[in-house]
């Protein structure tokens, strides 16, 4: 029986944790990143939240890590659709603007999971656009 592919959108905090966190915090991220049953999804917003800071701080290894991830991920560039869906989700669920854009991108990419480091008490978990998963739960 063929295994089901899990369409996975990683929030920026997950990628930052994967590279910068203490080993015990990196473990859950590495399990996700190394899961052969996952296909990764992304938006230009994740790229913007991660890559420029690594470049500014001259952290070449971190920059290469992000670039490797982005080459592997399927990215949407439909800004008009992301902005429209994100606005509606922010108004409906009260999520913050950047989270709304990430959730909209995940929804448009038909993600099965949106994985975040945001605690379950945060507004991103109120969204119903996509299944929101706390990385550390």
Roles of regions detected by a PLM:
Residues 1-42, 54-65, 136-137:
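Short, well-structured N-terminal submotif of metal-dependent ribonuclease cores
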Residues 1-7, 32, 49, 75-76, ...:
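Acidic, PIN/NYN-like endoribonuclease modules and their adjacent C-terminal/linker elements
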Residues 10, 42, 77, 97-100, ...:
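Short beta-strand scaffold positions
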Residues 14, 46, 82, 102, ...:
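Alpha-helix capping/helix-boundary segments
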Residues 26, 47, 63-66, 83-86:
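A general structural signal for well-ordered alpha-helical segments in protein cores
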Residues 36, 93, 109:
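Active-site charged/polar residues at nucleotide-handling catalytic sites that mediate phosphoryl
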Residues 71-92:
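Acidic catalytic patch
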């Amino acid at each position: 029986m063929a295994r089901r592919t899990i369409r996975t959108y990683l929030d920026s905090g997950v990628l930052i944790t994967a590279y910068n966190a203490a080993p015990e915090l990196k473990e859950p991220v590495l399990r996700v990143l190394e899961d052969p049953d996952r296909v990764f999804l992304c938006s230009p917003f994740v790229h913007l939240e991660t890559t420029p800071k690594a470049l500014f701080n001259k952290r070449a290894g971190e920059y290469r890590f992000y670039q490797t991830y982005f080459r592997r991920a399927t990215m949407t560039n439909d800004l008009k659709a992301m902005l429209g869906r994100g606005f509606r989700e922010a108004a409906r669920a009260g999520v913050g603007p950047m989270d709304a854009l990430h959730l909209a991108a995940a929804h448009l990419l038909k993600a099965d999971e949106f994985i975040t480091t945001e605690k379950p008490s945060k507004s991103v978990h109120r969204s119903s656009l996509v299944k929101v998963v706390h990385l550390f739960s």
